[in-house]
Amino acid sequence: MPVTQGSGALPARRIVFVHAHPDDETIATGATMACYAADPDTQVVLVTCTLGEMGEVLVPELTNLRADRADQLGGYRIGELEQACTELGVTDYRFLGGAGRWRDSGMLDSPANDDPRCFWRANMDDASEALVRIVREVRPQVIVTYDAIGDYGHPDHIRAHDVTVRAFADAADPDFAPDAGPTWQVSKLYETALSHSAVESAVDRIWRSDLAKTVPEGITMPSDMLLSVPDTKVTTTIEAPGFFAAKIAAMRAHRSQMTVDGFFFALVDGNGRSAKATENFVLARGAVGPGSGSGVETDLFDGVATR
């Protein structure tokens, strides 16, 4: 949960990750978060927008937690998130507006989209203010979230993007929520990205293994698989092989949402053997840093003044 800086001094580098549900932080940015969390001069803050109440339950003994049964999955996933953050070394993790403020919206065009409590229906002023309060407190140089289509079109991912983009501007506006603390201009806003080459490599690996039979029915790869971006659009690549084990351990912590022998786990981590802990990003706001000479940044803080 939130960590208070006792002396009032801020770490030199500060980064906020905004994700939709518990487990998204690990799947999309787990290695990156673990890498930065291990740096004593960097503060990593995770903001999760919902409890993930509408998630599927892949563990038979937990099926009664589902939304159409006891509707207790959200509380259970708080514990999973806590364990995952422990594995990643992240000590400052928060829910936007407080735990349960906005409910998981479910998949696009599902009845859950109509629930007035869901994040998809969130008032943008209210949601932005909730994030602005965190931004003005933490004063991050960098914020990370999804792209405009939410990586794969999930309403909560789309809303997380929209709220983050809005808060990026609102945090620097003295007329917006003046009681939320001194204004702060974030230097960079990044969107998570799957590159074409990474997806093609993962797909090829799956089709060449016994995992092909675990591909969900109806998916024809690669055309109907995960959305990806051209490699040339990627502005930043974080390679953190030393934190690959932490990412896998964090994925295992989300036991209600994924199995270690299935299609999705293999797609993300290369079946736990050959894949590197490489995560890609596209800079959406701010200036691209000098990079490492290849034209691609290797640090989300590249070119940012730390203070």
From Swiss-Prot:
Documented EC number(s): 3.5.1.103
A GO molecular-function annotation: zinc ion binding
Domain of life: Bacteria
Keyword flag Nucleus: no
EC category: hydrolase
Keyword Manganese: no
Reactions catalysed according to its record: 1D-myo-inositol 2-acetamido-2-deoxy-alpha-D-glucopyranoside + H2O = 1D-myo-inositol 2-amino-2-deoxy-alpha-D-glucopyranoside + acetate
Binding-site positions, Zn(2+): H21, D24, H157
UniProt keyword terms in alphabetical order: Hydrolase, Metal-binding, Zinc
InterPro entries xrefs: GlcNAc_PI_deacetylase-related, LmbE-like_dom_sf, Mycothiol_biosynthesis_MshB
GO biological process: mycothiol biosynthetic process
Cofactor note: Binds 1 zinc ion per subunit.
Cofactors, names only: Zn(2+)
Name of one Pfam family that matches: PIG-L
Family from the record: Belongs to the MshB deacetylase family.
Function: Catalyzes the deacetylation of 1D-myo-inositol 2-acetamido-2-deoxy-alpha-D-glucopyranoside (GlcNAc-Ins) in the mycothiol biosynthesis pathway.
NCBIfam families for this protein: mycothiol_MshB (TIGR03445)
Protein name per its UniProtKB record: 1D-myo-inositol 2-acetamido-2-deoxy-alpha-D-glucopyranoside deacetylase 1
